[in-house]
Amino acid sequence: MTLRVLGVDPGLTRCGIGVVDVEKNRRATMVAVGVVGTSPDESLDQRLLLIATSIDDWLDRYEPHVLAVERVFSQLNVSTVMGVAQASGVVIAAAARRGIPVALHTPSEVKAAVTGSGTSNKDAVTKLVTKILRLDAPPRPADAADALALAITHAWRAGSGAAIATTGPGSQSLTPAQRAWAEAEAKARRAR
């Protein structure tokens, strides 16, 4: 069976979106790629609405089995982190409304899966995404290439169980850190 993964590189100014079909033999094919751009001159609610509407369109058009979203990580620029977190929330909610599982991947996980090194730069990721997907030209801007890399990463890391091994609703597969967190929360609730 072919696994269809919609990758999202979330951002408030540029939100990269890429759809990839991956065969059991790991052969990946690009279905679609794009970037949703919003203007800093617009109000926050209008920017998030544009991202939400665009994601809804992509989900309805391409019907992915799973979403792969870049995990928000701490940066020095708090406003950038907030924008990424807000865009991520809109994307995750859109998937949840449709019952589509969502998997979160860190930037270093994506770099390691696509290039073999978790410290690769964006140019290396773009170059290898172009090669893996057998594209005539690199996807631009970098947000588009990153979205495709997220989709590839999820399919390759999760293997044949990629649609199941997610952090979404009904997930039976937790990372060790997620399992430890859940156990700590359960223990704290019992102690009350």
Curated annotation (Swiss-Prot):
Binding site residues for Mg(2+) 2: E70
Active site: D9, E70, D143
Chain segments carrying region Disordered: 163-192
Catalysed conversion reaction: Endonucleolytic cleavage at a junction such as a reciprocal single-stranded crossover between two homologous DNA duplexes (Holliday junction)
Skewed-composition ranges (Basic and acidic residues): 182-192
Ranges in a coiled coil: none
Location within or outside the cell: Cytoplasm
Taxonomic superkingdom: Bacteria
Gene3D superfamilies the record matches: Ribonuclease H-like superfamily/Ribonuclease H
PANTHER family: CROSSOVER JUNCTION ENDODEOXYRIBONUCLEASE RUVC
Protein's recorded name: Crossover junction endodeoxyribonuclease RuvC
Organism field: Arthrobacter sp. (strain FB24)
Species classification: Bacteria, Bacillati, Actinomycetota, Actinomycetes, Micrococcales
Gene assigned in the entry: ruvC
